[in-house]
A protein has these predicted regions:
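Short, surface-exposed ligand- or partner-binding patches at beta-edge/loop junctions that are enriched
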Residues: 64
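Rhodanese-like catalytic fold shared by cysteine-dependent sulfurtransferases
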Residues: 1-18, 26-60, 69-107
Length: 107
């Protein structure tokens, strides 16, 4: 259900297509973001279920937030809705900044 930032980086580097889904709020996304991600705030996930389902048919969804709590909740909910091709990035964007890309601001 979870994947580390290092695993995400390796999968992207190998050429695997992934959809990186940021479930933080727009203000958080403005503060710090990862390149080529799609912002779908947690509160809007149910309204975007069909879009997420279509995306998951095309490639795995990697869901992230600030520290990994909200994203894990979203992944659990998506799986309850029948979308299995999704994982939460453990530690969120904060861990990504610490381990992968220090140019991403930490807050």
């Amino acid at each position: 259900m979870e994947v580390t930032p290092q695993q995400v980086k390796q999968r992207l580097a190998s050429g695997e297509k992934l959809f990186l889904i940021d479930v933080r709020e727009p203000s958080e996304h403005q503060t710090a973001s990862i390149k080529d991600t799609q912002l779908i705030p947690m509160r809007t996930v149910p309204a975007n279920l069909q879009q997420l389902e279509a995306m998951s048919d095309e490639a795995p969804l990697i869901v992230f937030c600030h520290h990994g709590v909200r994203s894990l909740q979203v992944v659990q909910w998506l799986r309850e809705q029948g979308i299995e091709n999704c994982q939460s990035m453990s530690g969120g964007i904060d861990r990504w900044s610490y381990e992968i890309d220090s140019t991403v601001p930490r807050y």
